[in-house]
Structure formats: structure tokens, C-alpha cells
């Protein structure tokens, strides 16, 4: 049974055979659901918590 992986940027599920796999020099594999997530993470170094369209937003500090 193929397993579902999740996007490293937005956290949405990725079906087998879809998305972009990015392998870093140290061997870690980052999977992205779309080119939008890939470019935001790799090219622009954006923080996913600051993007309104990202699903895996974390609540800001409530201290």
C-alpha cells in the first residue's frame, strides 16, 4: 500500500507520484505538493507560519 506523505512547507497530503522531491546534500528528502510551496521554501526562504494560505499554521505565542 503506498503511503501518503505530507508537504514540508504547507503540510497538505501528497499522493504517490505527485509533487516535487528535493534532496539536500546531507541526504534528507523534502517533499513539496506544488511549485508554489517549493519556491516559497527553497528560493524565497519564507516562513510557513507567516503565509495565510498555508494549512499548518501555528498559533502565535500566547504567554
UniProtKB/Swiss-Prot annotation:
InterPro entries membership: L24e/L24_sf, Ribosomal_eL24-rel_arc, Ribosomal_eL24-rel_N, Ribosomal_eL24_CS, TRASH_dom
Protein's GO biological process: translation
Cofactor binding comment, as recorded: Binds 1 zinc ion per subunit.
Pfam family, one: Ribosomal_L24e
GO MF, one example: zinc ion binding
Residues annotated as binding Zn(2+): 7, 10, 33, 37
PROSITE patterns tied to this protein: RIBOSOMAL_L24E (PS01073)
Span of zinc fingers (C4-type): 7-37
Domain of life assignment: Archaea
Function: Binds to the 23S rRNA.
Family classification: Belongs to the eukaryotic ribosomal protein eL24 family.
NCBIfam families (UniProt xref): PRK14891.1-1 (NF034186)
Record text on subunit structure and interactions: Part of the 50S ribosomal subunit. Forms a cluster with proteins L3 and L14.
Protein name: Large ribosomal subunit protein eL24
Organism: Thermofilum pendens (strain DSM 2475 / Hrk 5)
